[in-house]
Amino acid sequence: MIAATQLPVNGFLSTGAPFVADVNLIVQLAMGGALVAGVILARKKRYRAHGACQTTVLLLNLWMIGFEMWPSFGLQIAPHLPRVFHTAYYTIAAVHAALGTAAELLGIYIVLVAATKTKLLPPSLRFTQWKRWMRIELALWLLSLMCGIGTYYEWYVAPFR
């Protein structure tokens, strides 16, 4: 594994963003595409492939949250809450964090419910309306992705225009 001190400081998208922010943006966009591919798999009733696709995205995103997004939020946003909602720099990032947290937690819950064949959750905590919950999850994820793109823009593109 590459140590963080060995990563380039400057990004590769020519926006003024650090390298890890550029990598995160590209990975998030790819995961958004993978989520849409997962929806297509579900519509084709290829549920095993759908589950593998969506779970992989969920776990990769959990890693990206821990590696890039949570530390950035903790350093740049959390110390200034709640008194900074008058600027897009903070507001978009805070909304992104809230939507992203909701999407990630719901995704983990969906995976746990899907795994109830092994009795991870008692019947009272399971749901049966899969389409509803999957659509809510997809909507949360896509809204979070859009806010994440907005955060990237506000942090790394807009200041240099």
PLM regions and their residue ranges:
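Alpha-helical membrane insertion/targeting regions
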Residues: 1-161
